[in-house]
Amino acid sequence: MVSTLMIASVKLRLYCTALIILCNQKNPSEFNVLIHKLIIKWGFMNKNFHFVSVFFIKF
């Protein structure tokens, strides 16, 4: 259980980093980064890693 959660959090961080880099290349605004931080916090609070990772892939 713990290892699955750790892997999920690492994957989530990777998606987050990639997404922020992509957004900063297209539109470097603090608002975008703030939205992504809120989404990430929501994902961690709900421990809904699958939904968040799917969201990041589709984004």
From Swiss-Prot:
Keyword Signal: yes
Primary residence: secreted
Annotated disulfide bonds: none
Residue ranges the record marks as coiled coil: none
Signal peptide per UniProt: 1-18
Expression across tissues: Expressed by the venom gland.
Compartment(s) of residence: Secreted
Keyword Signal: yes
GO terms under cellular component: extracellular region
Annotated keywords: Secreted, Signal
Family: Belongs to the non-disulfide-bridged peptide (NDBP) superfamily. Long chain multifunctional peptide (group 2) family.
Protein's UniProt name: Venom protein 37.1
Organism: Lychas mucronatus
